[in-house]
UniProtKB/Swiss-Prot annotation:
Belongs to the histone H1/H5 family. Residues 14-25, 105-194 have a biased composition (Basic residues). Signal peptide: none annotated. Residues 1-12 have a biased composition (Pro residues). The keyword Nucleus applies. Residues 26-99 form the H15 domain. GO terms for biological process: chromosome condensation; negative regulation of DNA recombination; nucleosome assembly. It is found in: Nucleus; Chromosome. GO terms for cellular component: nucleosome; nucleus. This is Histone H5. GO terms for molecular function: double-stranded DNA binding; nucleosomal DNA binding; structural constituent of chromatin. Disulfide bonds: none annotated. It comes from Cairina moschata.
Length: 194
């Protein structure tokens, strides 16, 4: 009798777990619906999340969790740069399409997105020279520091002048003291002459 393990039927169960293909949604993706809602509203200050939700619910057949899905897809569109937030912070506020996205449509939009991605690389290249310009600003800052130091150096030069003035005063005092002993010496000499 051998103790070899008997193969378990578990691997055969895995193919049964395969999910059935999803049913096609009765509406386009939430990001497309949001873009359509913002285009339809055409407000100058941007569209609020509430107005986007109203538009989506009235024009498309969406489920119970549409509000959450709209909120999440707005965040994704903001991160992707498709939308810009004009007012507010986070999920609250107003949104509008970025300038390049107004002409996009769903079938041709993907091709344009690829082109936009290529365009986005070229502004990044342009941003690199800007970074190169910033070191040019640093020498200006160093020059400003040098100017400050040069301004500080005359103050140091002024201090020796004050010391000189003090030395002049002390020398004058010494001269005056010397003159007094001379007078005394003259007085001493005069009695000897008598």
């Amino acid at each position: 009798m051998t103790d070899s393990p008997i193969p378990a039927p578990a691997p055969a169960a895995k193919p049964k777990r395969a999910k059935a293909p999803r049913k096609p949604a009765s509406h386009p993706s939430y990001s497309e619906m949001i873009v359509a809602a913002i285009r339809a509203e055409k407000s100058r200050g941007g569209s609020s999340r509430q107005s986007i939700q109203k538009y989506v619910k009235s024009h498309y057949k969406v489920g119970q969790h549409a509000d959450l899905q709209i909120k999440l897809s707005i965040r994704r569109l903001l991160a992707a740069g498709v939308l810009k937030q004009t007012k507010g912070v986070g999920a609250s506020g107003s949104y509008r399409l970025a300038k390049g996205d107004k002409a996009k449509k769903s079938p041709a939009g993907r091709k344009k997105k690829k082109k936009a991605a290529r365009r986005s690389t070229s502004p990044r290249k342009a941003a690199r020279p800007r970074k190169a310009r910033s070191p040019a600003k640093k020498p200006k800052a160093a020059a400003r520091k040098a100017r400050k130091k040069s301004r500080a150096s005359p103050k140091k030069a002024k201090k020796p002048k004050t010391v000189k003035a003090k030395s002049l005063k002390t020398s004058k005092v010494k001269k005056a003291k010397r003159s007094k002993p001379r007078a005394k010496s003259g007085a001493r000499k005069s009695p000897k002459k008598k």
